[in-house]
Amino acid sequence: VGDLRALIFDFDGTIAETERSGHRVAYNRAFEALGLDDRWDEATYGELLAVAGGRERLEFYFAGAYPERSETERAELARSVHATKRRLFDDIGPTLHPRPGVVRLVEEATAGGVRVAIATTAAPEGVRAFFAGHPTLGRAFGVVVGGDDVPAKKPSPDIYVLALERLGVAASDALAIEDSAIGLRAARAAGLATLVTPSGYTLHEDFAGAAAICNDLENVDLAYCRALVA
């Protein structure tokens, strides 16, 4: 039996629908900036989201797109594209909007003495770029753990374990909020009850093991979150 002391949010797809019109656009602009002919349409990008982490996603894609290149060359290309993409996302991030109910739930949690954190495979620059457009929301998150902070990305539980450590909260006293099956697996492996709000790219994934599945956070309040960990 838990006593809700923290909400730990995933970022991409959970706090905001960043993938389709955010990260995907930035990747395509990076390809163009580096003189590459590659372009990711919405369907292709949706399939690539099965690979967690931007650089890892690029390496996976380049293995299929450029089989004639060595693994070292492909890894270098992935690093170059990823670095360029991260810079380009700085302009896109602030224009994206939080998903329904996110701001209200974060405000309610903060007012109710429940801490809020972020545990994401996203690069910290991407999170900062988004919050540059939503500074009040950004200030509410006292703990932000990213993929660069841990040895293994989701579905490994490392990110959630570190977030709990930094919060000083037991897994039984926290609720994870995720949008993907990969994220759900990571949170569950860390011992967290998990509320899933599927995003545009994850609607058809298998969310077995979730404490609850909601279209969004519009009708989710702190009392509902408390009940999920009780």
Task: List each language-model region with its residue ranges.
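Short glycine-rich phosphate-binding loop at a beta-alpha junction
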Residues: 115-117
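Asp-based, Mg2+/Mn2+-dependent phosphohydrolase catalytic module
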Residues: 1-4, 103, 107, 123-230
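Conserved phosphate-coupling serine/threonine residues in phosphotransfer and NTP-handling enzymes
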Residues: 14, 120-122
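N-terminal helical cap/lid subdomain that shapes the substrate entry/recognition surface
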Residues: 2-103, 107, 111-112
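Structured helix-beta-strand junction loops
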Residues: 112-113, 209
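Residue-level marker of regulatory loop/turn positions in helix-turn-helix DNA-binding domains and
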Residues: 98, 119, 152
